[in-house]
Swiss-Prot record:
This is Uncharacterized 8.5 kDa protein in tk-vs intergenic region. It comes from Enterobacteria phage T4.
């Protein structure tokens, strides 16, 4: 994903948060190693809409706000 989305709590973008949730995820580490290098984390995600520079309403399905490593 090469798209940069603005932060949902930035007041200039007039973001409207639709929902917020947490889930446990696992990284897919690309390093070849004899031991397990994949890590688990708790991610806090939000779904929101914002107004872009051209005045159009844009929808962001999933934006990661916070990562807590387990």
């Amino acid at each position: 994903m090469n798209i940069h989305y603005p932060h949902p709590y930035d007041p200039k973008n007039k973001a409207v948060i639709i929902r917020q949730w947490e889930r446990i995820c696992r990284t897919k580490c690309p390093i070849n190693s004899p031991h397990d290098v994949d890590k688990d984390y708790i991610g806090t995600f939000v779904e929101y809409t914002f107004i872009d520079k051209k005045g159009r309403k844009q929808h962001v399905e999933e934006y990661c706000l916070k990562v807590t490593w387990l």
